[in-house]
Amino acid sequence: MRILVTGGAGFIGSEFVRATLRGTLPGSSGTQVTVLDKLTYSGNVLNLAPIADLRNYRFVRGDICDQDLVDDVVAGHDAIVHFAAETHVDRSIGSAASFVRTNAMGTQVLLEAASRHRLGRFVHISTDEVYGSIPEGAWDEESPVAPNAPYAAAKAAGDLLALAWHRTHGLDVVVTRCTNNYGPYQYPEKLIPLFTTNVMDGQQVPVYGEGHNRRQWLHVSDHCRAIQLVLLGGRAGEVYHIGGGTELTNLELAEQILKSCGAGWDMVRHVPDRPGHDFRYSLDTTKIRTELGFSPRVAFADGLVETVEWYRDNRAWWEPLKSPDEATGSPGDAGR
């Protein structure tokens, strides 16, 4: 199979590319991968260094909104796995234009190219944030989208465009929506790496409000395995939820990170809450479990310890990426 991975130099995209080319994902042996990435601040070619010399890998630097480039790159592929997105909620509140451009308009450009070249599958990677907050219970795939942040609204627009392309043009589209991710190579503005690297630098960790907002957490390797199952076996025109089932408040998460780093509560600093901060997200994952046999393999406690160890051992990777403003300001979107 020849797949085009957009945003493949980012956190989740690069994990998917590395695992695919190493043959550790189901049915990935022999896959040829092209990565298309603009290399914005959160994209990093070092994330792809472990597989950069493989013959079945190609990297193209470019913008998914560039119609001519996208049309040229898409040609000759069997499928697109579309990770490319602007993902920082706080940045979207301050300036939404780039989020709408990339997450909605960029998706449209890719869908048009996929239709022209008659690709066999388009997997659109999305987020639980498109549903907005849910006080109890869990959203299923039939729940209506009701995003609150501009980031989530732009992602929802991309989701709806992708599904509309299936219904209108017959393109084989599948949408995945996932809970928060964590693991190696995550940009240090995000909650877990921000907290972890702050503690390693002797700086306090900033917790929004009272710290009672709740999120579900999934290791990035489990997310990518689920995406591969959807790529190979998901039903066209469907949405699949991907989640880990480990739900924590931000304070509970901070406690586990501090424990893993050998630090105490004096390292916590409460900061003003984000405008329109969703209190809780939760996804029902029955569909992907029953149809595709997915279940997470990485226990959160084990994965968190391994993640903290990775940041401890890879300061040379994250230190150049981390600005003083990120260390002292508010945490970014938790796990995208």
Swiss-Prot record:
* UniProt-listed CDD domains: dTDP_GD_SDR_e (cd05246)
- One family from Pfam that matches here is GDP_Man_Dehyd
Catalytic residues (positions): D128, E129, Y151
- The answer on whether this UniProt entry bears the keyword Lyase reads yes
Top-level taxon in the UniProt lineage: Bacteria
Keyword list (alphabetical) reads: Antibiotic biosynthesis, Lyase, NAD
Q: GO terms for biological process?
A: antibiotic biosynthetic process; nucleotide-sugar metabolic process
Catalytic reaction annotation: dTDP-alpha-D-glucose = dTDP-4-dehydro-6-deoxy-alpha-D-glucose + H2O
Q: Which SUPFAM superfamilies match?
A: NAD(P)-binding Rossmann-fold domains
InterPro entries associated with the record: dTDP_Gluc_deHydtase (IPR005888), NAD(P)-bd_dom (IPR016040), NAD(P)-bd_dom_sf (IPR036291)
Cofactor(s) recorded in Swiss-Prot or TrEMBL: NAD(+)
GO-annotated molecular function? dTDP-glucose 4,6-dehydratase activity
Q: Which sites bind substrate?
A: 87, 127-129, 180, 190-191, 206-208, 215, 250, 274-277
Q: How is the cofactor bound?
A: Binds 1 NAD(+) per subunit.
- Give the pathway: Antibiotic biosynthesis; novobiocin biosynthesis
Q: Which residues bind NAD(+)?
A: 7-13, 37-40, 63-64, 102, 151-155, 181
Q: What does this protein do?
A: dTDP-glucose 4,6-dehydratase involved in the generation of the deoxysugar in the novobiocin biosynthesis pathway, an aminocoumarin family antibiotic that targets bacterial DNA gyrases.
Which family, according to UniProt?
Answer: Belongs to the NAD(P)-dependent epimerase/dehydratase family. dTDP-glucose dehydratase subfamily.
How does the annotation summarize its subunit structure? Homodimer.
Instruction: State the name under which the record lists this protein.
Output: dTDP-glucose 4,6-dehydratase
Give the species this sequence originates from. Streptomyces niveus
